[in-house]
From Swiss-Prot:
This is Large ribosomal subunit protein uL2. Keywords: Ribonucleoprotein, Ribosomal protein, RNA-binding, rRNA-binding. The keyword RNA-binding applies. It comes from Salmonella arizonae (strain ATCC BAA-731 / CDC346-86 / RSK2980). One of the primary rRNA binding proteins. Required for association of the 30S and 50S subunits to form the 70S ribosome, for tRNA binding and peptide bond formation. It has been suggested to have peptidyltransferase activity; this is somewhat controversial. Makes several contacts with the 16S rRNA in the 70S ribosome. One of its GO terms (molecular function) is rRNA binding. PROSITE patterns: RIBOSOMAL_L2. The lineage of its organism: Bacteria, Pseudomonadati, Pseudomonadota, Gammaproteobacteria, Enterobacterales. PANTHER family: LARGE RIBOSOMAL SUBUNIT PROTEIN UL2M, RIBOSOMAL PROTEIN L2. One of its GO terms (cellular component) is cytosol. Residues 28-53, 221-273 are annotated as: Disordered.
């Protein structure tokens, strides 16, 4: 994998930095594991904008990724690594010994021809999935379940991982990349190693159009708007003279947004600033 800085042949190419991985499959994805993925444009079923700055972008097909990794005791061979437009991580197409194929998140160091396995008897090596009660304390893992059998939810982005720092009875304590310490049931599964494609964070789009290709629309500052459009709008100068708020008047910049008190007891330490 190489990080390539483009030559300044035009203003739009001058600042582009891209990640090139010659190991990625150059053909089409495995058709039985692909389904249609319609864009919402940030609108809900009433047609109202629920998430700003979303719209347009290249059409994408959704790759069905196996986050549960519940095919126990059957070894699988990695056939190829693939690009996935729906996530920052790459994915791997694996062939199980019984003939079934599945997509999984590609961990760091995984390559075509490697063998992986799931279940309590799986070896402690990158790419294998086990319940966390069977994984040594201190190990780095990814694709971590929050409820047994639900499928991995934590640490799925490129280059991310979670560290198991303690095991106490029915729970294990995890240290997330944000600094948060959290308890999860020991029967929850996790995949050993960290997610691959860590160089994703080094890429530079280089121009606004590259963001539009990805379905990202412009973000306009509130101070650049009129008073009818935003609480920060209007005025002769650049100051808006009040505490920063969202377009709907809700305090921003530091205001707590977490409301799920039911699971507060599982958070040992809040994330570091």
């Amino acid at each position: 994998m190489a990080v390539v800085k483009c030559k300044p042949t035009s203003p739009g190419r001058r600042h582009v930095v891209k990640v090139v991985n010659p190991e990625l499959h150059k053909g089409k994805p495995f058709a039985p594991l692909v389904e249609k993925n319609s864009k919402s444009g940030g609108r809900n079923n009433n047609g109202r904008i629920t998430t700003r700055h979303i719209g347009g972008g290249h059409k994408q097909a959704y790759r069905i990724v196996d986050f549960k990794r519940n095919k126990d005791g059957i070894p699988a061979v990695v056939e190829r690594l693939e690009y996935d437009p729906n996530r920052s991580a790459n994915i791997a197409l694996v062939l199980y010994k019984d003939g079934e194929r599945r997509y999984i998140l590609a961990p760091k160091g995984l390559k075509a021809g490697d063998q992986i396995q799931s279940g309590v008897d799986a070896a402690i090596k990158a790419g294998n999935t086990l319940p966390m009660r069977n994984i040594p304390v201190g190990s780095t893992v990814h694709n971590v379940e929050m409820k047994p059998g639900k499928g991995g939810q934590l640490a799925r982005s490129a280059g991310t991982y979670v560290q198991i720092v303690a095991r106490d009875g029915a729970y294990v304590t995890l240290r997330l990349r944000s600094g948060e310490m959290r308890k999860v049931e020991a029967d929850c599964r996790a995949t050993l190693g960290e997610v691959g494609n860590a160089e994703h964070m080094l890429r530079v789009l280089g121009k606004a159009g590259a963001a539009r290709w990805r379905g990202v629309r412009p973000t306009v500052r509130g101070t650049a708007m009129n008073p009818v459009d935003h609480p920060h709008g209007g005025g002769e100068g650049r100051n808006f003279g009040k505490h920063p708020v969202t377009p709907w008047g809700v305090q921003t910049k530091g205001k707590k947004t977490r409301s799920n008190k039911r699971t507060d007891k599982f958070i040992v330490r809040r994330r570091s600033k």
